[in-house]
C-alpha cells in the first residue's frame, strides 16, 4: 500500500508554519532559494510531495534541528509531525496494517507515486477543483462552485500550464479565494467519487444529527392555547 508516504503527509498537514519566513531581506531571499530546492527534491509537481520530502530529509538521520536551521524549516513543526506519525503508526499496527517503506520513498524521485496520489483523492474527494477553461482559476466541485486560485506558495503557481483537476488541502479567503497545498490528479481517479459529494450528510459527519433543522412538515404541532379561565 502507500501508508509510508501518506502517513507523514497527514502528519505534516496537521502542523502549522512549516516554513520559516525570515524578516531580513537577505535571509528571506535565502529561504526562498532553499524552499525552492526542497520543492525540487519532492519532484516539483505537488505541494504534498514537497511536505513529504521535507519530512523525510529532516528525519532520515543526523541532527533534525541543524537540518531545519539550514533549510529554513521550523524544527518544532517537524518534531510535532514525528510525534503524530508515531501515533498514526501505532493505530495502523493495531489494525494490522503493514507499511512498506521501500516502495514509497519520494526523495530524489520525479513525483509522488500514483498510489499515494490516488489515496489523497479518496481522502480529499470533497476538495476537488477543476480549471476554468481559458482562465487560470478553478471551480470547486463541492456543490458551491467557488471560484478559487492557486496559492502563491504552491509549486504549481505561475506554471506554464495548469492541471485540469486538482485536490487541495484547504481554502484561504483573502481578496480572492486561494487553494493551498495542491496535487494534480486524473479525472479517472475521481469520477466515481464526485457523486458522493451530493450524498454527504454534513450533520452526521459533525455529530450534530440531533440538531438537524427540521422541515415544516416535521415540526412538532404547537400546543393549543390554554382555555380562558372563567
Say what each PLM segment does:
Residues 1-215:
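Second RecA-like catalytic domain
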Residues 212-230:
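Acidic, low-complexity intrinsically disordered tails
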